[in-house]
């Protein structure tokens, strides 16, 4: 959706993921329900999974991923980022935890055990070859709902509720205040109605509607209207 930039913060004050990575832009969720452009919500969920897994996803309009596909892909992304990839990695993580005197979860399942038989061989081989890419997402628990608990960059505290995160194509709408700002005192009038012209290009006046007129009349200041 289009919107205005209401606040620009230094990167260290931006909300950040559990592994310390800051967000670039935060959008108000009220921009979604009334406009009913729900595609962007599905897009942001799928983009998160695609980014974590490190590949592009093609999803044609009438033959694309449905909600369950997206949730399954998010599950897979979470397993890829946060579970050991194979038995070798599992053993290494267990040894590391023991060395540090930490408890390692007994029920930890490797990514290979979960997904090797489910995925195409090419996809699985690709994920296996590019597993270094997981470091960016390690320590970010990704739920089936695509939400993550963020911390406030200013206080370090967690926000009350989990927040939907992801990647969107976001374009700059070229309407800038510097080009729009305008004011006038006296200026050109319409020949026919003798009212001030409208718009910045004509050096026009601001429209003063019925209700604004009533506000002045209520204060007994109707003559202010002459200009």
Give the predicted meaning of each segment.
Residues 1-227:
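Long insertion/accessory domains within large nucleic-acid-processing enzymes
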């Amino acid at each position: 959706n289009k919107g205005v930039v209401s606040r620009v913060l230094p990167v260290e004050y931006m909300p950040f993921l559990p592994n310390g990575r800051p967000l670039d832009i935060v959008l108000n969720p009220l921009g979604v329900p009334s406009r009913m452009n729900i595609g962007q919500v599905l897009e942001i969920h799928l983009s998160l999974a695609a980014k974590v897994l490190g590949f592009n996803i093609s999803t044609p309009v009438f033959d694309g991923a449905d909600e369950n596909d997206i949730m399954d892909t998010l599950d897979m992304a979470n397993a890829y980022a946060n579970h050991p990839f194979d038995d070798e990695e599992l053993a290494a993580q267990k040894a590391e935890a023991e060395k540090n005197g930490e408890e390692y979860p007994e029920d930890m399942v490797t990514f290979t055990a979960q997904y090797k038989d489910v995925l195409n061989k090419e996809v699985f081989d690709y994920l296996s070859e590019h597993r270094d890419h997981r470091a960016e997402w390690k320590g970010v628990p990704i739920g089936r709902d695509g939400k993550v608990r963020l911390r406030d960059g200013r206080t370090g505290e967690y926000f009350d509720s989990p927040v939907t995160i992801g990647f969107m194509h976001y374009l700059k709408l070229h309407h800038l205040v510097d080009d729009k700002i305008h004011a006038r005192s006296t200026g050109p009038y319409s020949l026919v109605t003798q009212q001030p012209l409208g718009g910045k290009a004509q050096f026009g006046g601001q429209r003063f509607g019925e209700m604004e007129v009533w506000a002045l009349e209520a204060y007994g200041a109707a003559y202010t209207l002459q200009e």
